């Protein structure tokens, strides 16, 4: 299990106890600094004060459990307009929206695709309508995915 998944399982109860959805978390390095980026949401969106409240709660859990080796920076935010997509339910929620995905392994010589999310089946297979074809991929094949903000309406 990846460290991000372990952290997700560790902090999810604290986030949910405050009435928020833990959309996902990512652990990465930016220069010499380790960053734990946590995305939270609720119906109607989440504000800065609420992010601060969640941050304090997550910090308390992480201080007790100490799952990250060394120093790190905790960033808590809304998922934003180009929100990450992690689960089948995320894709289902945004059927009809444009997304960009990066696959773990190339398919037909390509790892990155942009298209409209058109379906998610019970086997967690995501279907995207690309410009000229349909792409079906399992969640396990997807390394990273985000919505594409549509400012044209």
Swiss-Prot record:
Organism: Coxiella burnetii (strain RSA 493 / Nine Mile phase I)
Signal peptide: none
GO cellular component: cytosol
GO biological process: ribosomal small subunit assembly; translation
PANTHER family, A to Z: RIBOSOME MATURATION FACTOR RIMP (PTHR33867:SF1)
Keywords: Cytoplasm, Ribosome biogenesis
Function: Required for maturation of 30S ribosomal subunits.
Protein name (Swiss-Prot/TrEMBL): Ribosome maturation factor RimP
Subcellular location: Cytoplasm
Family per record: Belongs to the RimP family.
Disulphides: none
Gene: rimP
CDD domains: YlxS_C (cd01734)
UniProt keyword annotation of Cytoplasm present: yes
Domain of life (superkingdom): Bacteria
Database matches in Gene3D superfamilies: Ribosome maturation factor RimP, C-terminal domain, RimP-like superfamily, N-terminal
């Amino acid at each position: 299990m990846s460290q991000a998944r372990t952290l997700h399982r560790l902090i999810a109860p604290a986030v949910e106890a405050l009435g928020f959805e833990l959309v996902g978390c990512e652990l990465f390095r930016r220069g010499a600094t380790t960053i734990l980026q946590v995305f939270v949401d609720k119906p109607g969106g989440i504000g800065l004060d609420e992010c601060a409240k969640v941050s304090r709660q997550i910090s308390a859990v992480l201080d007790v459990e100490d799952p990250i080796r060394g120093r790190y920076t905790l960033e808590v935010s809304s998922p934003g307009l180009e929100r990450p997509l992690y689960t089948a339910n995320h894709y289902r929620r945004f059927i009809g929206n444009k997304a960009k995905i990066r696959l773990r392994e190339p398919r037909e010589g390509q790892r990155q695709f942009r298209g409209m999310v058109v379906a998610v089946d019970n086997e967690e297979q995501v279907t995207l309508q690309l410009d000229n074809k349909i792409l079906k991929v399992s969640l396990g094949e997807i390394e990273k995915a985000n919505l594409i903000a549509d400012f044209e309406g």
